[in-house]
């Protein structure tokens, strides 16, 4: 070797050569669980260009993948499927835990969530953040590359010799043994919890419940309410009682009377209540002033003609927790009643298929009962053995109780719970005659994060970050929906400047959400280009949002009474630069898709629903407006200052996938109009309310007077005490109507918080939209509905 080595010759070891090839051509499995996966997808777009690392092509089957990125929350119901995918992956293989939830459960120490995926899978690299930015994911990938290059010796295993190592070699962690069960999460070893050794860290030590507070302010009802109440007295007499509702007219009836009362309200009155808005229950057993009954069934109805809501309540006792089903009156009631059965144990006589919907079939107890544990760390440790008890049932199980189809040879096709076409962890089971869909069922709950249960242990302000993660593509729109209900409950007036800031951010997030939908929907039907344009524009929106709030997907920026800070220097120039260019980008989307023969063939006449069917099924938002009904809460029931803006309600005819596309494309233009108006007309003045009983005081006020300082201390520690009462309010979110039903017992947090999301009724309609279509059409229909799994399962 005395001669010099030519420049085109490289000397290395076999270990280094194998490691070099592996680390520069990672094959990630397509495995998205939650919010983090959206940021992971962002790393594959032009701004970040993951292709530089040779890892930009996600594999649709585990047999072609060697890297599993647990991007998002690891759910207990998903554990068995997660293990199955991992076991089918090629060797050697590696695991990255992306985000706080995957690392440790994050902010979701709740009954349905594993406190870290490392309880069932070995993890090579942990990426912090909630969610991590695309840059953080790329840093995690480089960390894994470095681990492969420095710590693995694959030559001997490759040559079938003893010794060496490759792939993941770390052990899984045992909850409570090799892994902490501290309710505050990892990293607190040997750090004492607050209070004494005899005191639970969640002790209720404040005096808010015993202090005087103002009553809930009463909203003036419409003039049509009095004639309606008179009609009810004539028809039902004393069988239906009026309750003193402060937010909407409220009726109380015995359970047996409920179906007839609801039928009367839907069919027999002028200006009927056509849509079942929501159906839920309240466990009354922990009330400070406990009523005689144990449970209350609550029905919320919507009248399009009255532009208003009505509430019906039915008291129940634990020993007779049964009410007649109303699925014959509203098909949308099917899933709502199953959820009430699952979460509360309420039975519905006459329901066609009463079974659990969110929790696994073998789950013990009903999670929204006050007696059910809230925290995962208060329950037995979750292990691989536990996961084996939650294996999803066979596909044939879902059709075993249905009438057989004569003279057809049928097959079962399982789609999900992990499939690129389902846009998240959702299982769709198809019953097929050849390629034609005879019947269809959905298994949901794989993304259930216990959001409503968590609200019962957080104070009103602490819960705001959790709302960001309901529809994790809608950002501040979630905050607005929650705060609209809480502010109405408390009677808080939001200053004009704060209203405009909220509208500005909400419409930017509406555009960002529609862009993700547009790009992925186009991709579903074979158009590859739009998704890159869509994510490019989305990143420009996030630049503005980050400038104003400091965050991207989940800024948690709204507060009771306004926003936490004023707009920063440079915000107007950033908004104007975006609005100047984005209109041309909308035109590009229009040219790319609207006239495309393949796009139209895949979408026109597919997944058709009439206006009447859409109302019966609980549709809202763009999916409802695609049937020709011009119903938009921003116009029909204005809130948050939207009555000060000039924009059109976009509708389309046909009620098919193409009509739903046209509505959302048009809404991009209308939201752009609103953003421009908000920027140009931004008023001066306060950005947070001066009603400091409920709102955070401005910093300078806290430095000037003791009252403001005391309120700030109380709001940060125990939280504001809301009046005893209840309030349901909804907003027009990007996917439809998102409403919060806040029930207060006079304390600093919700006694019961119900979240009415648009994704839940929309996905319930999938069988009606799909029967008689082909398998390929299901992917198109799913995409056209625009749902998010966290919005669906909460």
Curated annotation (Swiss-Prot):
It comes from the Bacteria. Residues 1-154 are annotated as: NADH dehydrogenase I subunit B. It catalyses: a quinone + NADH + 5 H(+)(in) = a quinol + NAD(+) + 4 H(+)(out). It is a peripheral membrane protein. It is an enzyme of class 7 (translocase). The keyword Ribonucleoprotein does not apply. In the N-terminal section; belongs to the complex I 20 kDa subunit family. In the central section; belongs to the complex I 30 kDa subunit family. This is NADH-quinone oxidoreductase subunit B/C/D. The gene is nuoBCD.
